[in-house]
């Protein structure tokens, strides 16, 4: 029997804050994949070095080196895991900037699977996820429908330790379910594309 292909996931965090709970979710997802999901690897893709989108920086169809490197990582990924807080009912400015850079011709997001997770107060970042889904329509991203993952990071008992490490086992299991759904959709889409 042929070995299952390795699904390469690009993990993007909408928060640039060092102690971000959303970055904590990405770190936990990487650990979960390493420990308990065969055939799936997550690479954290740092969006903080990207300049603000400015088409004056595009020269003869090329982009600044940091943007070219980012676009290459997005292009090489089989799918995406977005972790973003909610800012004013939307995704963060840095995440939107990264999305915009990778959507410049040619759009390197297209026809790939994606999942979203978010941690925050109140609704746990849910409205940012719904806005990201709307943006994904234009990008031809295919988001998993279920399970949805919104985490009220401030609700007791604590979900993260003082270093931003996810410690809550139930939350880890919910995150694992998202990853398995993402893996299944990515494999399905790869099968259609190859």
UniProtKB/Swiss-Prot annotation:
Induction conditions: By P.infestans.
Reaction equations catalysed: a quinone + NADH + H(+) = a quinol + NAD(+); a quinone + NADPH + H(+) = a quinol + NADP(+)
Gene Ontology CC entries for this record: cytosol
Entry annotated with the keyword Secreted: no
Keyword NAD: yes
GO molecular function: FMN binding; NADH:ubiquinone reductase (non-electrogenic) activity; NADPH dehydrogenase (quinone) activity
Source organism superkingdom: Eukaryota
Subunit-structure text: Homotetramer.
Protein's UniProt name: NAD(P)H:quinone oxidoreductase
């Amino acid at each position: 029997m042929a070995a299952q292909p390795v699904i390469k996931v690009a993990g993007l965090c909408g928060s640039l804050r060092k102690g971000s709970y959303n970055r904590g979710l990405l770190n936990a997802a990487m650990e979960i994949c390493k420990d308990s999901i065969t055939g799936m690897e997550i690479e954290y893709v740092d969006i903080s070095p990207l300049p603000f989108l400015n088409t004056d920086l595009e020269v003869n169809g090329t982009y600044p080196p940091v943007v070219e490197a980012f676009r290459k990582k997005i292009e090489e990924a089989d799918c995406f895991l977005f972790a973003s807080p909610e800012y004013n009912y939307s995704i963060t400015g840095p995440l939107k900037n990264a999305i915009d850079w990778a959507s410049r011709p040619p759009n390197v997001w297209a026809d790939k699977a994606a999942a979203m997770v978010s941690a925050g107060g109140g609704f746990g970042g849910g409205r940012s996820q719904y806005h990201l889904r709307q943006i994904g329509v234009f990008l031809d991203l295919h988001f998993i429908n279920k399970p949805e993952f919104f985490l009220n990071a401030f609700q007791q008992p604590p979900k993260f330790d003082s270093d931003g490490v996810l410690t809550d086992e139930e939350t880890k299991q919910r995150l694992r379910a998202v990853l398995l759904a993402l893996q299944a959709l990515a494999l399905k889409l790869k099968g259609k594309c190859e």
